Amino acid sequence: AQEFVNSKIQPGKVVVFIKPTCPYCRKTQEILSQLPFKQGLLEFVDITATSDMSEIQDYLQQLTGARTVPRVFLGKDCIGGCSDLIAMQEKGELLARLKEMGALRQ
């Protein structure tokens, strides 16, 4: 589970660990999908499709202090979940961070 998570989290890439049935995950997907990401730099990882979902959530707990989804990573930094993403978006920090990372098309 640790290797799986670590293989997904990469500098310059936005990765969101999700469960498809979770409304907060869907909201997060909606927000991020509207932004002009460069190809391959936005990934949604469905942890229900893995055999070790609870181990993945345990590792996310270790890594980020919470095992709930969505867990949003901007590069190697976990910014939290859906409400954290919305707060960043409202302050204009989200676009700034994504531009800084080089994740968006010009």
From Swiss-Prot:
<feature type="disulfide bond">
    <location>
        <begin position="78"/>
        <end position="82"/>
    </location>
</feature>
<keyword id="KW-0249">Electron transport</keyword>
<feature type="modified residue" description="N-acetylalanine">
    <location>
        <position position="1"/>
    </location>
</feature>
<feature type="domain" description="Glutaredoxin">
    <location>
        <begin position="2"/>
        <end position="105"/>
    </location>
</feature>
<comment type="similarity">
    <text>Belongs to the glutaredoxin family.</text>
</comment>
<dbReference type="GO" id="GO:0015038">
    <property type="term" value="F:glutathione disulfide oxidoreductase activity"/>
</dbReference>
<dbReference type="InterPro" id="IPR036249">
    <property type="entry name" value="Thioredoxin-like_sf"/>
</dbReference>
<protein>
    <recommendedName>
        <fullName>Glutaredoxin-1</fullName>
    </recommendedName>
</protein>
<dbReference type="InterPro" id="IPR011767">
    <property type="entry name" value="GLR_AS"/>
</dbReference>
<dbReference type="GO" id="GO:0005739">
    <property type="term" value="C:mitochondrion"/>
</dbReference>
<feature type="modified residue" description="N6-succinyllysine">
    <location>
        <position position="8"/>
    </location>
</feature>
<keyword id="KW-0676">Redox-active center</keyword>
<dbReference type="InterPro" id="IPR011899">
    <property type="entry name" value="Glutaredoxin_euk/vir"/>
</dbReference>
<keyword id="KW-1015">Disulfide bond</keyword>
<dbReference type="InterPro" id="IPR014025">
    <property type="entry name" value="Glutaredoxin_subgr"/>
</dbReference>
<dbReference type="InterPro" id="IPR047185">
    <property type="entry name" value="GLRX1"/>
</dbReference>
<dbReference type="InterPro" id="IPR002109">
    <property type="entry name" value="Glutaredoxin"/>
</dbReference>
<keyword id="KW-0813">Transport</keyword>
<dbReference type="Pfam" id="PF00462">
    <property type="entry name" value="Glutaredoxin"/>
</dbReference>
<dbReference type="GO" id="GO:0051117">
    <property type="term" value="F:ATPase binding"/>
</dbReference>
<keyword id="KW-0963">Cytoplasm</keyword>
<keyword id="KW-0007">Acetylation</keyword>
<comment type="function">
    <text>Has a glutathione-disulfide oxidoreductase activity in the presence of NADPH and glutathione reductase. Reduces low molecular weight disulfides and proteins.</text>
</comment>
<feature type="disulfide bond" description="Redox-active">
    <location>
        <begin position="22"/>
        <end position="25"/>
    </location>
</feature>
